[in-house]
């Protein structure tokens, strides 16, 4: 993999990992033109995005750890842990028992983008008719944990999109509160998933022939771009709905279906 392709994939990962437009879907599509990427490369660029959001939320995370004696912090942290554990257990079942593999064609991704776009529009409509509560309930925590697995099974769904809008529909009508919980749950989830895949890759000898310069470039680019993207998103949702992302998903999904039908992509 050349360095320009590595940087481009880092940009794609950085932009799409935490925006509700599906990073996995975009990367699978990008692979059609930029070439196949190794498991190690996937792990590295995702690690960059995770690091970015960890830096953004480091004060909040530190507050939860140091302020665990406070009931509100303890309750919030417990819900994060429950959501993470649900994802971890279901993830192992999907991986080890069901032997799930990501699709390599664009058509299922296109449909997931389209369906997810309409789902986002509905979620915004439904949430607007509820009081904008900031509270994260136990129901929200459980459903967010499940939503992370659903997003992992269906690339194009978007982990952030699925978790944010499940939280909004389940009672957390405040966009900022739903987004924060979704991102905070994503931090341990993605670190655990990346760590698991990294150990597996080293064990299988998959890291032996990697271009570490390309990996380093992709990691740095992914971190910087993800930091900018998340900062922008958090500012954007203070006064805007997610409708822009929903429309983008639907348009992209339709375009991909057309390209797949005409043989432009696989």
Swiss-Prot record:
A GO molecular function held by the record: undecaprenyl-diphosphatase activity
Q: Does the keyword Calcium apply?
A: no
Provide the transmembrane region boundaries.
38-58, 80-100, 108-128, 136-156, 176-196, 217-237, 245-265
Q: One GO cellular component from the entry?
A: plasma membrane
Which EC number applies?
Answer: 3.6.1.27
Q: Does the keyword Membrane apply?
A: yes
Q: How does it sit in the membrane?
A: Multi-pass membrane protein
Per its UniProt record, what InterPro entries does this chain match? Answer: UppP (IPR003824)
The protein's annotated catalytic reaction(s) are: di-trans,octa-cis-undecaprenyl diphosphate + H2O = di-trans,octa-cis-undecaprenyl phosphate + phosphate + H(+)
Q: Which GO terms describe its biological process?
A: cell wall organization; peptidoglycan biosynthetic process; regulation of cell shape; response to antibiotic
Q: Which family does it belong to?
A: Belongs to the UppP family.
Any additional notes?
Bacitracin is thought to be involved in the inhibition of peptidoglycan synthesis by sequestering undecaprenyl diphosphate, thereby reducing the pool of lipid carrier available.
* Protein name (database record): Undecaprenyl-diphosphatase
The encoding gene is: uppP
């Amino acid at each position: 993999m050349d360095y320009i392709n590595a940087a481009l994939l880092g940009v794609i990962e950085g932009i799409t990992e935490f925006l509700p437009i599906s990073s996995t879907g975009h990367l699978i599509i990008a692979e059609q033109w930029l070439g196949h990427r190794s498991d190690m490369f996937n792990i590295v660029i995702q690690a960059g995005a995770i690091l970015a959001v960890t830096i953004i939320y480091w004060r909040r995370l530190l507050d939860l750890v140091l302020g665990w004696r406070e009931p509100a912090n303890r309750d919030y942290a417990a819900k994060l842990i429950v959501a993470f554990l649900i994802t971890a257990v279901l993830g192992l079942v999907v991986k080890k028992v069901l032997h799930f593999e990501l699709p390599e064609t664009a058509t299922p991704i296109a449909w997931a983008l389209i369906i997810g776009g309409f789902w986002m529009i509905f979620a915004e409509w439904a949430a607007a008719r509820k009081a904008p509560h900031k509270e994260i309930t136990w129901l929200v925590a459980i459903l967010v944990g499940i939503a992370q697995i659903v997003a992992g099974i269906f690339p194009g769904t978007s982990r952030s999109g699925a978790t944010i809008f499940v939280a909004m529909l389940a009672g957390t009508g405040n966009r900022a509160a739903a987004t924060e919980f979704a991102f905070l749950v994503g931090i341990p989830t993605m670190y655990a998933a990346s760590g698991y895949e990294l150990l597996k890759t080293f064990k299988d000898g998959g890291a032996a022939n990697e271009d570490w310069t390309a990996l380093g470039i992709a990691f740095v680019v992914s971190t910087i771009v993800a930091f900018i993207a998340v900062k922008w998103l958090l500012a954007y949702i203070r006064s805007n709905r997610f409708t822009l992302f929903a429309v983008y998903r639907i348009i992209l999904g339709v375009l991909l279906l057309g390209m797949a039908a005409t043989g432009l992509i696989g």
